[in-house]
Design a protein with these regions (language model features):
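Nucleotide-activated chemistry modules centered on ATP-dependent adenylation/adenylyltransferase
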Residues: 1-234
Length: 234
């Protein structure tokens, strides 16, 4: 979307906002630097904290360093008594992605704390393609934003269409933007991590295993097997 706007194939954006979880892949940060070097549209980085370090402080169910509750990642669970598998509810996207962007939008509008935002004051674009239409929000997360999906309602582009567009324009294919230890990684995505990132994820996986007074063990791989032991060739 950013590059299509840069090329004039979509309306000109006022700004792009990247919400940094503090635990992104090195390739993601390199891509961000690259984009800043080639487009005139401002790219603003915001942050709601470091999701990995907050997790270390909270140990799954406790409090972060600032005394605030930690937002769960969607870890997989295995009950020690029954062996039943489950999954924790995801809260991290709202706390580390949606909320920091909302706060930045309020700053851009010049709003002070507790000042009511005008309804529909911001048009916010989200890069969801046609084949990911199931991810479209049923409603805007707040009254000040009108959410648009340019790849769906301004053009009709699938993820492969986006990749072909980048190739036609001579741009390198970007990495998938996700936390290093995101439980939604496929085996291919776990394999694509560089060595340092994978070892970091293994360390994190061991750290969360049986913390927080839960009845079960916690894992970041969907198999509920320690990441270090998973056969990622499947």
């Amino acid at each position: 979307i950013l590059l299509m706007s840069h090329h004039g194939e979509l309306p000109k954006l006022d700004a792009a906002i990247f919400s940094d979880t503090g635990w992104e892949r090195e390739a993601t940060y390199l891509r961000l630097d690259y984009l800043r070097s080639i487009v005139s549209i401002p790219i603003i980085t915001v942050s709601g904290g470091n999701v990995r370090e907050d997790m270390r402080e909270a140990q799954v169910r406790g409090l972060k360093k600032d005394g605030v509750r930690w937002a769960n990642m969607p870890f997989y669970t295995r009950d020690r008594s029954t062996g039943n598998l489950g999954m924790l509810r995801r809260q991290c996207t709202r706390e580390y992605k949606i909320e920091p962007i909302r706060k930045e939008l309020r700053l851009m509008l010049g709003l002070v704390p507790r000042q009511r935002a005008p309804q529909g004051a911001v048009e916010q674009w989200v890069g969801i393609s046609v084949d990911e239409a199931h991810r479209v929000w049923a409603r805007s997360p707040d009254r000040m934003s009108t959410i648009r999906y340019p790849l769906i309602d301004m053009t009709t582009m699938t993820r492969n269409d986006c990749l072909r567009w980048l190739e036609r324009k001579g741009y390198p294919i970007p990495p998938k933007s996700a936390c290093i230890g995101c439980p939604f990684h496929s085996n291919r995505e776990w394999s694509d991590l560089n060595e340092a990132e994978f070892l970091d994820a293994v360390d994190f996986d061991e750290m969360i295993r049986n913390k927080g007074g839960m009845k079960g063990d916690i894992f970041i791989h969907r198999s509920c097997v320690p990441l270090a032991e998973v056969d990622l060739r499947n």
